Amino acid sequence: MKRTRGSICSPAGCHPVLGDDRVGGGKIIGVITLPADALDKPYKAKRGSAWVTQVRAGSTTRDAPHEEEAQLHMQSRRLPYDRKAVPGAGLDDLDMRRLVNYFRDVRRQDCPEPRDRQGWEQLLVNTDLMVEGQERVMLSVGGLLLFGTRPKRYLPQAGISAAAYPGVQKDYAARARQVITGPLVSLFAAAQTSAYPYMPVTFSESSQAVEAGVIEQALDFVRRNIEIKAWIANDGRRMERWDYPLEAVREAIVNAVAHRDYTIGVMDIELSIYADRIEVISPGRLPNTVTVAKMRAGYRASRNELIKEVLRDYRYVEATGLGVPRKIIAGMRAHNGSEPDLIEEEERFIVRLWKG
């Protein structure tokens, strides 16, 4: 059975369910069930050292002609990856506190009672955070990453691997290490009602986080592992200055979680702090028609539109798309006169901020 399973798993990674069934005459046959709503389609069968796309035709299986295989791939790609279903992941895998926080306090809209499963599933399907499958409602990739309590259970690549090194190269003797995982967004204090009727206080960047998500945890890791210099100004005021502008660091982290290629499994985002620089490395090349030159100019394009939309609601992402030129490039120039490196290298994208 294991050998058979290995012969039908596509290299992209589907996970057939193995079982058995008793038929007439007391014979037992092996049953292999392929998930109908897997992330990576079409399925392939192994023939020798090659993988062959096959389709069902009535009660038989046949090889798909090149044109049909191309059509199957095209149909799979039409749906953005962050809107695809995650088999096995459901409503119970979400942090209900964050969901209420998002719809009630961030979006300022009514939401179902916490125990109203059907109401929540319908709302989340309507907002693409869940997907209706053939047999059940499942989380979308974006829904799991944004609000999932343990996204790595289903998506091993859902996290940030952070390390702080004493020198300018990677070292086994790191000063600090942390695997950062959980929901991308923080849990924020509920919005307060204004003293003036019909004028609620809207969610903003100044809203207080009461439980950090991945983005804030990553920024906290940076704060703990860089220095802050303090001095007394001529007018007697205490002045402070971090090694790096935190707004630029935050923008680099947000861009990584919003735009990385989540189809590349297992590989986390890398956040590395060296003696002379900070590096944020995102798996995957730049999305769509984006180039480094276009990024510097503020070109707007996204690989994970659902994730970006929700992060924009939380004010993590600028609606103008000018986060890179304004916060990273201009921010580093103003801070220490350095020019940040934006590098597309093989199957990864690197943002490098220099200490100066």
Regions found by a protein language model. Name each.
Residues 1-51, 56-59:
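Divalent-cation
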Residues 16-19, 255, 264-272:
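A short glycine-rich, hydrophobically flanked beta-strand micro-motif that places a catalytic Asp/Glu
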Residues 20, 161, 268-270, 339-341:
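Short, surface-exposed charged micro-motifs
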Residues 54-266, 289, 293-300, 315, ...:
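Active-site helix-to-loop segments that bind/position phosphate- or nucleotide-bearing substrates
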Residues 265-291, 298-310, 314, 322, ...:
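Conserved glycine-centered short motifs in functionally critical loops
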Residues 318, 337-343:
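Glycine-rich ATP-binding loops of the HATPase_c
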Residues 347-355:
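Short C-terminal beta-strand
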